Amino acid sequence: MAEQKRNRREEILQALAAMLETSPGQRITTAKLAANLGVSEAALYRHFPSKARMFEGLIEFVEDTLLTRINMIMDEEKNTLSRCHAILQLLLTFAERNPGITRVMTGDALMGEHDRLRGRMEDLFNRIESSIKQILREKAMREQQRFIVDEAVLANLLLSYADGKISQFVRSNFKRLPTEHFSAQWQVMEQQLISA
């Protein structure tokens, strides 16, 4: 029974993500979501007490996926720039593979929803920025080199790049892929980081 309930919850979240992808700029109502799934709104509320909880389910997926992978990168990669590259690539690739959820990441799908949802996404991006800042600060210990520019400034620059590419993806209705030109752009950023 619990497995069936979890499967239904996942099905609801997948349908919500798909609707966010195919209906850019439109607000998703529980009535539209229920109709898309072929169930009643009451059936949705048996699995989620509110639409905000549905969005929280998507946010939890984003948090779990990204933070788990970032921790893996921290364990597997030892070089500062390789770690930064891997985290940026992770963010861009995740967004590209999950267009509907990307609208949640940018806050686009959360307009008019509960403020705590946007706060959770902001907190996630702050945590990612803190991870990047920590990586940059560890360079002094790992590689016996420090950056000339403050690590907080560099971490913000790197995250802003990814945030901008993800926002561009949403604004273009998912036509401008976040990974477009990433290799060439990373080479420029890497050279700047080496001299920073």
Curated annotation (Swiss-Prot):
It comes from Idiomarina loihiensis (strain ATCC BAA-735 / DSM 15497 / L2-TR). Homodimer. Interacts with FtsZ. Belongs to the nucleoid occlusion factor SlmA family. It is found in: Cytoplasm, Nucleoid. This is Nucleoid occlusion factor SlmA. Required for nucleoid occlusion (NO) phenomenon, which prevents Z-ring formation and cell division over the nucleoid. Acts as a DNA-associated cell division inhibitor that binds simultaneously chromosomal DNA and FtsZ, and disrupts the assembly of FtsZ polymers. SlmA-DNA-binding sequences (SBS) are dispersed on non-Ter regions of the chromosome, preventing FtsZ polymerization at these regions. Pfam families: SlmA-like_C, TetR_N. One of its GO terms (molecular function) is sequence-specific DNA binding. It comes from the Bacteria.
